[in-house]
Design a protein with these regions (language model features):
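Residue-level signal for inorganic ion chemistry
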Residues: 1, 29, 68
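Short, small/polar residue-rich loop motifs at catalytic or cofactor-binding pockets
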Residues: 5-7
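Glycine-rich phosphate-binding loop of actin/hexokinase-like ATP-binding domains
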Residues: 9-39, 78-79, 83-116, 156-215
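Gly/Ser/Thr-rich active-site cleft segment
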Residues: 13, 49-163
Length: 215
């Protein structure tokens, strides 16, 4: 089995995997905007592109961790791991701390999924972030304790899990190159499946309107 939850959120937990506060949601929670601006000035544009791959924004988990460090030091001090909603559920089911979202956690992880210890110090300790795994990797099984709490069968294999958008993409068949879908909700996303890594394209700063559709 696998779990999905809102992507690019940040949930600090203690050593018993108990949430220390409500999760900070993805980019619609803009509380870390000042941290994003500070980091942009701190690194400079060229270094930002190298480390983050895009302009830093409140959707980046690193900015949320920095916000917690600055504004909720008592929560920050008690944090054993900074997780996502999905990795929290996986940890509660299996006792294993793994995470898929290394992209949203840049620059805390390197491209190969290993911890970027050289950059971690500004945000957190290297041991406060979970090990990376692919979303379909089997990372453990449902523990007897989790089975008693959920009604699931003990020993059921559990995969890493993923964010909401990825799960929705798979649910509508976005698994072959050339397929695409739109996701509507609090945010709108367009997904297109390719057979190679495309990378990120930097958009101009500021507000604007983009016309879509066919006339």
């Amino acid at each position: 089995m696998g779990t999905s939850a809102l992507g690019t959120d940040c949930l600090p937990v203690d050593e018993q995997c108990r949430p220390l506060r409500p999760a900070i949601l993805y980019g619609i929670d803009a509380r870390a905007s000042e941290e994003a601006a500070w980091l942009t000035e701190h690194y400079g544009q060229a270094r930002v592109q190298e480390l983050f791959g895009h302009p830093i924004c409140s959707g980046d988990t690193a900015t949320k961790i920095l916000w917690l460090r600055r504004h909720e030091p008592e929560i920050y001090a008690k944090t054993a791991y900074f997780l996502t909603g999905s990795s929290f559920l996986t940890a509660r089911l299996t006792g294993k701390y793994v995470i898929l979202a290394k992209g949203s956690f840049r620059p805390l992880y390197q491209a190969d999924g290993s911890v970027n210890e050289a950059e971690c110090g500004l945000y957190c300790r290297p041991d406060q972030i979970a090990a990376c795994a692919w979303s379909t990797d089997i990372v453990g099984t449902v523990t007897p304790e989790a089975a008693a709490q959920t009604g699931l069968a003990a020993g059921t294999p559990v995969i890493t899990g993923t964010g909401d958008s990825t799960a929705e993409a798979i649910s509508v068949g976005l698994v072959e190159p050339g397929t695409a879908f739109f996701q509507y909700g609090s945010s709108m996303f367009y997904y297109y499946c390719t057979d190679h890594f495309v990378g990120s394209y930097v958009s101009p700063q500021g507000n604007g309107a983009l016309k879509g559709g066919k006339e």
